[in-house]
Amino acid sequence: MEILHDEDVDDSILRDKTIAVMGYGAQGDAQANCLKDSGINVVIGETEILGGNKNPSWEKAKEDGFEVLPIDKAAEKGDVVHILLPDEVQPAIYENQIKPQLKAGKALCFSHGFNICFKRIVPPEDVDVIMVAPKAPGTEERKAYLEGFGVPGLVAVKQNPSGEAREVALAMTKAMHWTKAGILECTFEQETYEDLFGEQCVLCGGLVELMRNGFEVLVEAGYPPEMAYFECVHEMKLIVDLVWQGGIKRMAEVISNTAEYGMWAVGHQIIGPEVKEKMKEALKRVENGEFANEWVDEYKRGIPFLKASREKMGEHQVETVGAEIRKLFAQK
């Protein structure tokens, strides 16, 4: 894939446009401030009152110097309507507050393709649909911008009736300094399917289960829980940092020969062909929409499984022991 940088992108197309950022959470905060600091006209769309109280996100956006409007008013004002709300709440807010404000020539922008990919949001045909997706959390994104650099990102175009959708999306990434690191062009489907697969099988689901099971095996074999936590959870960051810095090869060069031998001799016996087949099944469930339907149904029912899972993990010994171990690293 070609990687695009500053010299490949012209962001002047944004100079006469207003970007309405919907939501002022971690990504809304980071992206809106980066755009604003690059001279782009940005307004924030938020809910002013939540549960009878002032919405902290509304107040913070005002304190940060933004014009903050109700979501429908911001959508009306924006040439680019950039939806950075949680996936599960986007469809209802879009249908009731954003869709009535759309007209030909506007662009709908996302940082994750879930609702477009699975048709939870179906935009009008005369509206551009684009995606700008940073490959970093909001805090790191903003930190990199302030340091004069940026984070890598993805760009995708789903609809382009105006003929300038790609240019607008790329211009947004340049204004946020992502092109200083590098931009990859993809499709909504590629970003969505790979993101969900990675979260479920490797980064979140796979990693958590690997750590939890490793911890349990040691504890059940009679080893001290504190030592089990160090070996199976705490030291994970040390290894991941090495991979992040120089790849798997570099990590293997840095660890001891004993550790490397064990990695090659035993690792494939734990994560073997049968696990790979399970991963393939999970990918199919993502691609055919089965997982999306399951998650939407879970949300409609009040997230009972999610709540129960959170409670169960909170009570697990790995969490109670971990809380004590982390105190050892807290500065007094």
Swiss-Prot record:
Residue sites binding NAD(+) per the record: 24-27, 46, 55, 57, 87-90, 138
Enzymatic reactions: (2R)-2,3-dihydroxy-3-methylbutanoate + NAD(+) = (2S)-2-acetolactate + NADH + H(+)
Span of domain KARI N-terminal Rossmann: 1-186
Co-factor: note: Binds 2 magnesium ions per subunit.
CC cofactor: Mg(2+)
Keywords: Amino-acid biosynthesis, Branched-chain amino acid biosynthesis, Magnesium, Metal-binding, NAD, Oxidoreductase
Source organism, top-level taxon: Archaea
Ranges for domain KARI C-terminal knotted: 187-332
Chain residues that bind Mg(2+) 1: 195, 199
One Pfam family in the UniProt entry: KARI_C
Recorded metabolic or biological pathway in which this protein acts: Amino-acid biosynthesis; L-isoleucine biosynthesis; L-isoleucine from 2-oxobutanoate: step 2/4; Amino-acid biosynthesis; L-valine biosynthesis; L-valine from pyruvate: step 2/4
Signal peptide stretch: none
Binding-site residues for substrate, renumbered to this chain: 256
Gene Ontology molecular function terms on file: ketol-acid reductoisomerase activity; magnesium ion binding; NADP binding
PROSITE patterns the record matches: KARI_C, KARI_N
Described purpose of this protein according to its UniProt entry: Involved in the biosynthesis of branched-chain amino acids (BCAA). Catalyzes an alkyl-migration followed by a ketol-acid reduction of (S)-2-acetolactate (S2AL) to yield (R)-2,3-dihydroxy-isovalerate. In the isomerase reaction, S2AL is rearranged via a Mg-dependent methyl migration to produce 3-hydroxy-3-methyl-2-ketobutyrate (HMKB). In the reductase reaction, this 2-ketoacid undergoes a metal-dependent reduction by NADH to yield (R)-2,3-dihydroxy-isovalerate.
Annotated family: Belongs to the ketol-acid reductoisomerase family.
Protein name (database record): Ketol-acid reductoisomerase (NAD(+))
Organism in which the protein naturally occurs: Uncultured archaeon GZfos26G2
